[in-house]
Amino acid sequence: MNNAPHLYFAWQQLVEKSQLMLRLATEEQWDELITSEMAYVNAVQEIAHLTEEVAPSTTMQEQLRPMLRLILDNESKVKQLLQIRMDELAKLVGQSSVQKSVLSAYGDQGGFVLAPQDNLF
């Protein structure tokens, strides 16, 4: 069975999904990125299934190589953008924790307002 056209089409679809994920990450559309990830994973599994059935010829491998490079480059860029986002979120969580600690320590002073006073001596 010659699945070369189907395999090539599956790789083209994977490239499109990869480019979509990169665009979503670049535009900081994180919810949409997460949603699109499942379609990407399914496309990768489809390609794995197709290549298990029949190994691609050397010619087909040469045709697919640029697509694979593009996909790997896109994936690397998406990972970098995700790491930046994770760092931003960690910073926000840290700030939130500090604010919570400050409020917890100083927020409840038994109804008294703490204010500097003049020295009475």
Curated annotation (Swiss-Prot):
Homodimer. Interacts with FliD and FlhC. Belongs to the FliT family. Pfam families: FliT. Residues 1-50 are annotated as: Required for homodimerization. One of its GO terms (biological process) is negative regulation of bacterial-type flagellum assembly. NCBIfam families: PRK10548.1. Dual-function protein that regulates the transcription of class 2 flagellar operons and that also acts as an export chaperone for the filament-capping protein FliD. As a transcriptional regulator, acts as an anti-FlhDC factor; it directly binds FlhC, thus inhibiting the binding of the FlhC/FlhD complex to class 2 promoters, resulting in decreased expression of class 2 flagellar operons. As a chaperone, effects FliD transition to the membrane by preventing its premature polymerization, and by directing it to the export apparatus. It is found in: Cytoplasm, Cytosol. One of its GO terms (cellular component) is cytosol. Gene3D superfamilies: Flagellar protein flit. Residues 60-98 are annotated as: FliD binding. Keywords: Bacterial flagellum biogenesis, Chaperone, Cytoplasm, Repressor, Transcription, Transcription regulation. This is Flagellar protein FliT.
